[in-house]
A protein has these predicted regions:
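Membrane-embedded alpha-helical bundles that constitute the cytochrome b-like, heme-associated redox core
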Residues: 1-149
Length: 149
């Protein structure tokens, strides 16, 4: 959902949407934290060794774990103070991890659901993420091309 804010702003011209991006990203981290805590508590009773074994052996758990771990620095550095401390360029570079995070989260969902059910819903999320990333790549390519002319 966070990845949709910038393309929606570009397409609609409603620049106020950017004000909600941080909040939506933090909600995503909150959801991921609850999801991880539930997994860690109910599936492993806070046993680190058992959890790590699960992360190591089950690909969908590995993908979910990667997505969660990558979200931690994004949430921690989401404040204006961290933007100033890191500098805009380094902060932007760090926050590009959201693209890998989104792909890992979709992969986690796809692998988990496809074990028991046809993967229709995860496929829709994968298509959405692919379209959003393609749109960003196309826009960046068009911008670079326009600046060269």
């Amino acid at each position: 959902l966070t990845l949709t804010i910038t393309p929606m702003r570009w397409l609609t011209g409603i620049n106020q949407l950017i004000n909600y991006r941080r909040l939506i990203g933090l909600f995503a981290f909150f959801y991921g934290s609850l999801h991880f805590t539930t997994f860690f508590f109910f599936d492993h009773q806070f046993d680190f060794a058992a959890m790590w074994e699960d992360v190591r052996l089950r690909p969908y758990i590995t993908a979910g774990f990667v997505a969660f771990v990558l979200m931690v620095p994004l949430a921690l550095t989401s404040t204006t103070g961290w933007i100033r401390r890191l500098g805009g360029r380094k902060w932007n570079l760090l926050h590009r991890l959201i693209y890998i995070t989104a792909c890992a989260a979709v992969l986690h969902y796809y692998w988990k659901v496809s074990i028991k059910l046809p993967p229709t819903n995860p496929r829709n999320y994968a298509i959405l993420v692919a379209v959003l990333l393609a749109f960003r790549l196309w826009r960046n390519f068009a911008r670079k091309r326009a600046s060269e002319v």
